[in-house]
Every structure is written in structure tokens, then in C-alpha cells.
């Protein structure tokens, strides 16, 4: 019965995800993401080089993979990049701002006629951009694309179901999760995964986790007094959430 419930939950999330995700898993609900996806679709039909800009975790590599199916190489590994240029007709180059020798790169690309779709979390000078790329796509951070946040949470929830084989998180409500957008998709994914993990914790897991946490912090003369808030704060917060007032909490807690 439990597995049946999990299968239904996973299927439900799959349907929600399918509504906003194409086969590349690039979410496009906000105006900015839709425009970026339109540009990416145009790039699939031509062979020009393109640069994708944006903060860490905004989906640059995902969009690049939507444009071309090609090896991915980090620009900081310059010798590896040069070697791959010799043997591939197209490449995805991460962290283009870390290139150490742009002149040598340009010679290699022209010599082997290799196409690149590059990504960068830092701005690239206008002259370099014009020299290497015919099109530039900028993906704004998630805090400026709020329409994409919940669909991304649905996607990460589906990932969590698959990762944990449907063994946890069937009671998690995505609307109750506070999304962490500080590091875009990296922190947002962690928010969802943490919620799924915590929903599966029983008393034994919580005690074990607290024991490990406290073991790294005890050693002073007033540890019990200083660390008692770790019990008090969750009790008070959960009391307010469940009972609504200090008077009700007092009656319930005794």
C-alpha cells in the first residue's frame, strides 16, 4: 500500500513536471526563461557560437545542453580544451572567463572549425564577446524569475522521489518549503532535498543527528545552559504553529 501511494505521488509529480519541462529539463515559465529558450531553439538550427551568461546555478549548462549534444569541458583545463577542439566538431565550454590564452583558443577554433557554446558566471569584455560569439544569452537569477521557482521545486521533488526510490517524503507539501534562492538552483534543490530527508526522520535519526551536532560544540563550563535553546526554540515555534497563542501553549505544555 505504501509503495502504491508513493507510485501515485511520483506519477502526480511527473505530470506536474511534464507541464513545464521539455526533454532537456530546462524550466521556462518566466518571461526571461522563455526568451532564453527561444534563443536556444534558434541556435539548434544554425552553427554559430554562443555565450550564455548568468550567476552560478541559473541553468546555463542545462540550456547549453539543450542547444547541442557535445562534450562539456571547463575552461580552466585549457590543455584539455585544446585537445578536445582537435577531436570534436562542437563543445560546451564552462567558465569561459577562465580562459588563459584567448589568442591560442581562437587559432585552434578557426583551424579545426569547432563550434562552441560557452557559459560564464562573470561578464566577458565586449571585444572578446564580439571576437568569439555571434549571440549572447543572459539568464537572470532566480530571485528575478519567481515564476520558475515552483516548477523547479516540482522538478527537484521528482528527483528526490527517484533518488530515494520512493521511500520517503510522500507527506511533503512543496508549498510549505521555504525556498532558498541564495545560490539559485543549487540552494533551491537543497531546500527540497532537505525537506524530503527531514520528513523521513524518526526519533532515532533525530537523536543521532543531535548527538553528532553537540559532540562538536561541547567542552565549556556552561554547555547545558548555552545549548538548551536547541530544545526550547523548536518547542516554542512548533507550539505557536500548532496552537496559535502563548496561552494555548501554556495549557498544552503544562
PLM regions and their residue ranges:
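Loop/turn-to-beta-strand initiation segments
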Residues: 87-90, 111-117
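Short acidic, S/G/P-rich loop/turn micro-motifs used as interaction or catalytic elements
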Residues: 56-59, 78-79, 96-101, 123-125, ...
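Interdomain "pre-motor" coupling segment immediately N-terminal to P-loop NTPase/helicase cores
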Residues: 1-18
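Bacterial C-terminal helix-turn-helix
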Residues: 1, 56, 60, 217-254
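Conserved RecA-like P-loop NTPase ATPase core
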Residues: 36, 52, 58, 64-67, ...
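Walker A/P-loop
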Residues: 47-75, 80
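Conserved P-loop NTPase "ATPase switch" module shared by AAA+ and STAND
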Residues: 75-104
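Nucleotide-binding/hydrolysis machinery
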Residues: 19-31, 38, 46-48, 55, ...
Amino acid at each position: 500500500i505504501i509503495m502504491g501511494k508513493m507510485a501515485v505521488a511520483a506519477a502526480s509529480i511527473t505530470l506536474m513536471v511534464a507541464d513545464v519541462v521539455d526533454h532537456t529539463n530546462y524550466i521556462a515559465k518566466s518571461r526571461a526563461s522563455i526568451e532564453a529558450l527561444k534563443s536556444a531553439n534558434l541556435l539548434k538550427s544554425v552553427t554559430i557560437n554562443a555565450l550564455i551568461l548568468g550567476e552560478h546555478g541559473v541553468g546555463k549548462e542545462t540550456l547549453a545542453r539543450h542547444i547541442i549534444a557535445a562534450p562539456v569541458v571547463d575552461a580552466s583545463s585549457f590543455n584539455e580544451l585544446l585537445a578536445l577542439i582537435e577531436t570534436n566538431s562542437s563543445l560546451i565550454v564552462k567558465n569561459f572567463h577562465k580562459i588563459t590564452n584567448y589568442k591560442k583558443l581562437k587559432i585552434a577554433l578557426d583551424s579545426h572549425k569547432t563550434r562552441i557554446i560557452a557559459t560564464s558566471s562573470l561578464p566577458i569584455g565586449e571585444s572578446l564577446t564580439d571576437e568569439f560569439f555571434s549571440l549572447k544569452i543572459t539568464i537572470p537569477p532566480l530571485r528575478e524569475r519567481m515564476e520558475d521557482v515552483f516548477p523547479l521545486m516540482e522538478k527537484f521533488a521528482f528527483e528526490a522521489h527517484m533518488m530515494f526510490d520512493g521511500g520517503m517524503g510522500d507527506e511533503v507539501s512543496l508549498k510549505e518549503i521555504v525556498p532558498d534562492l541564495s545560490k539559485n538552483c543549487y540552494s533551491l534543490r537543497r531546500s527540497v532535498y532537505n525537506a524530503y530527508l527531514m520528513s523521513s526522520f524518526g526519533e532515532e535519526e533525530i537523536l543521532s543527528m543531535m548527538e553528532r551536532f553537540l559532540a562538536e560544540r561541547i567542552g565549556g563550563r556552561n554547555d547545558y545552559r548555552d545549548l538548551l535553546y536547541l530544545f526550547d526554540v523548536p518547542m516554542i515555534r512548533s507550539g505557536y504553529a500548532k496552537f496559535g497563542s502563548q496561552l494555548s501553549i501554556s495549557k498544552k505544555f503544562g
